[in-house]
Amino acid sequence: MTDQQLLWLLQLSDSNFPSGAFSHSFGFETYMYNEQICDAKTFREALVVYIQTQLTYTDGLACRIAYEQLEANSMEGLQRLNETLFALCLAKETREGTRMIGERLWKLCRDIYGVDELDEIVQTTRSIHPAIVFAAVGRKIGAAKQTTVLTYLFASVQTMVQNAVRGIPLGQTDGQKLLVMAQPYLIHAASIIETLDEEELGAAAVGLEIAQMQHERLPVRLFMS
């Protein structure tokens, strides 16, 4: 990897990158409201489960598949993947939040990195999944597939941790400790993703999906999902 590629990936994975992800907890706020997540320890436990299930088998695997479809120049495969990912989002808030983040990420990356390979999909469906956009950027800048996937995993967890710092709340030092704690799990997840078949896309934690559905009925909310 060149220094320039490294800097591009660091910029893209920065939690301050304005994709809008900071406005979404993707169901974690339901656990916070019910006091199932109330401190660094309980968040750590939930985060590990998230990494080992939904992040690995849905978002992370989707990023790998998207990269491979881009390598094969298969717009049909990307379109099918995009439709499948949104169909897997059972909770309305999560589905809409993912759509908004994906659209914002696509617009930013189109302007910044010149990623125009996804224009046809966006124009046809009016939606694009963030994992697909991330894969497109990784391939555009010449980052290896495995590096792109691992960076996407870290970026996703970094956003969740920063949102937990605000939502629980936690100290900034606790947040950084959680990121260090998560790194071996992310490396392991990336290695698992390399071995998965496309048919395994979509395995998730049922409890988290239910929490995502319940979120829209919370009387007080800090996050949009």
Swiss-Prot record:
The keyword 4Fe-4S does not apply. Coiled coil: none annotated. It holds the Pfam family UreF. GO terms for molecular function: nickel cation binding. Signal peptide: none annotated. Disulfide bonds: none annotated. InterPro entries: UreF, UreF_sf. It is found in: Cytoplasm. GO terms for cellular component: cytoplasm. Keywords: Chaperone, Cytoplasm, Nickel insertion. Required for maturation of urease via the functional incorporation of the urease nickel metallocenter. UreD, UreF and UreG form a complex that acts as a GTP-hydrolysis-dependent molecular chaperone, activating the urease apoprotein by helping to assemble the nickel containing metallocenter of UreC. The UreE protein probably delivers the nickel. Belongs to the UreF family. This is Urease accessory protein UreF. It comes from Geobacillus kaustophilus (strain HTA426).
